[in-house]
A protein has these predicted regions:
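Extracytoplasmic cysteine-anchoring/structural motifs
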Residues: 1-210
Length: 210
């Protein structure tokens, strides 16, 4: 379907995109393993527990990790409202498994938009905005983004510089939308994709008129 917009409307809430599901494992961790990210650093579960204990009460991970765990449904409101020892006990007992109070494939999705992120088995998602005219170099110029009728778009993955999000980015999310008013050229990108526009295939046939 065609989706074009005026120059100033080239924003996340309007631009056609492709969501790429991939597995990204940071250097130093076992391939396809589960991990956490916090302030640009990556941790296994055991490493996160160790790092957590290094922080003073009321600061750093002692604040951010309980917020994430509560939103993800692993820490109850009562535990979150309790004293520091209660929170510490929940963190110490963290494990991977299928129950609601264990880390699993849904944890990073339910606990989205927190300072702490959880990537289950290294799965993450990347937004790829469709660039129509690759020759337009000026930011937010008319025709830079969009899908135009009678064109085929070929996307070629070129590089990945970091993990995407543990959830599918969605500007229509009623609780925590990916900011729909963000200009396309200002959106974060951790995956490099080359987009080429392929010509349509033309078919010819001879016709005899009688």
């Amino acid at each position: 379907l065609e989706n074009t917009m005026e120059a100033k409307a080239q924003q996340l809430g309007f631009t056609t995109k492709v969501v790429v599901k991939a597995k990204y494992t940071p250097y130093g961790l076992n391939e396809n393993s589960s991990y956490f990210s916090w302030k640009g650093n990556y941790y296994t579960l055991d490493q996160l527990k160790t790092e957590y204990l290094k922080h003073s009460d009321g600061s750093g991970l002692k604040v951010d990790l309980p917020i994430f765990l509560k939103k993800a449904g692993i820490m109850t409101q009562e535990q979150f409202d309790g004293d520091q020892d209660t929170k510490n006990s929940v963190v110490a007992s963290l494990s991977e498994g299928a129950t609601a109070t264990q880390l699993n494939a849904k944890t990073g999705i339910i606990g989205r938009f927190c300072a702490v992120r959880y990537y289950h088995e290294s799965v993450c998602y990347y937004d790829v905005l469709i660039r129509h005219d690759q020759n337009v170099t000026e930011k937010m110029a008319l025709g830079r983004y969009g899908v135009v009728r009678n064109n085929w778009y070929h996307l070629e993955l070129q590089s990945v510089s970091g993990p995407g999000t543990p959830w599918i980015p969605d500007p229509s999310d009623p609780d925590n939308p990916t900011p729909p008013g963000t200009d396309d050229d200002e959106a974060d990108a951790y995956i490099s994709v080359k987009i080429t526009i392929n010509p349509w295939t033309y078919w010819t046939q001879g016709v005899d008129l009688h």
